[in-house]
């Protein structure tokens, strides 16, 4: 007999968000070896500025050689480490986070808890702030992985704060109160609000007015405020990034023990494989408990050593942040212009590694069933893995998250060519031969049958 965790289906793996990934992994596009494969546009990964980091590593071979002042530090890094983390690394992280926020916020390393990525950080916070069956309110659309990260092992429930396209998905007082009341009607004990700023999947930064509203709301309700700020260094256009800590400081709530921030180097530096994340909190009990829990997901000492040196180079970090934002802006503009040529529009965005794309005009009907059918066609026939809005708990059918920073310029052009061919074909034009060939139709049909078993209701 296995545990309920093993035999249950609460992980969320049957979401279209994960199903699209599975199909991509079976048949990934390659510019030379598999030009008819699926292009991965469902992965929020930043590969646009790797060359800057690689150049720095070439110029600092002693870091990869695990040396300091020409002496080996291998032994001290290889032995057991205090799970509070290397002081040099925490100092460097504090300065880097401050630089992103233009030093309007200062970070105290004693209030930091290092974790193996933001997934671990968010889950650890749920363990610290809520009991099984308690609820957190999250603005929707939201990152599909939260259904796994926040709920699966903790037993915490998520109640969506319904935001709408008509006002650019702004968080409103009415939407907050509605979510809170819905939670109470379901006998859920609301423990806090969690936001992603900038938003995943919208690619927009939360405004100062929204943050002020959120802090007033959580303070009035006496609940926690969690701000996941892993995309804070990707804001490439106005309005500039504003941290919840900055607004809290202005509201004389700077030392509030119910305000917590999550950060990671996965998006800003494009290092998800390094598994570097952290929790920042003024709450001593949260910091203490989270530090103990971090022993289940530590950052390797070698990784901390490398990044402490990298992030301590002020000239490098300044240049990297500026150049990375420039490249993100250019790539986003290329995606938006390519989609526009095909008659497709996007939500106006200023941050992140993705766009929130409006395909409502391509739906056969204004339903999530129609969205699911369109998504299946885009993955199967067009060969693009994108994330449907229903997987992000969007209330309106026809919106999709499309990632743009995890591929080369050449692959982006292939994707845009496929989109245009698909739209032309839908409009009665002739579909281009960049789509799937006849040889693979039988495989597609088998997969369509599998996808059809996933109902829209289960994804919402």
UniProtKB/Swiss-Prot annotation:
It catalyses: S-adenosyl-L-methionine = 1-aminocyclopropane-1-carboxylate + S-methyl-5'-thioadenosine + H(+). Substrate binds at residues 45, 83. Induction: By indole-3-acetic acid (IAA) and cycloheximide (CHX). 1-aminocyclopropane-1-carboxylate synthase (ACS) enzymes catalyze the conversion of S-adenosyl-L-methionine (SAM) into 1-aminocyclopropane-1-carboxylate (ACC), a direct precursor of ethylene. Belongs to the class-I pyridoxal-phosphate-dependent aminotransferase family. GO terms for biological process: ethylene biosynthetic process; fruit ripening. It comes from the Eukaryota. The modification N6-(pyridoxal phosphate)lysine is found at residue 267. Keywords: Ethylene biosynthesis, Fruit ripening, Lyase, Pyridoxal phosphate, S-adenosyl-L-methionine. This is 1-aminocyclopropane-1-carboxylate synthase 11. InterPro entries: Aminotransferase_I/II_large (IPR004839), Ethylene_sulfur-biosynth (IPR050478), NHTrfase_class1_PyrdxlP-BS (IPR004838), PyrdxlP-dep_Trfase (IPR015424), PyrdxlP-dep_Trfase_major (IPR015421), PyrdxlP-dep_Trfase_small (IPR015422). The keyword Lyase applies. Homodimer and heterodimer. In vivo, the relevance of heterodimerization with other ACS enzymes is however unsure. Interacts with GRF3. Expressed in roots. Its EC number is 4.4.1.14. It comes from Arabidopsis thaliana.
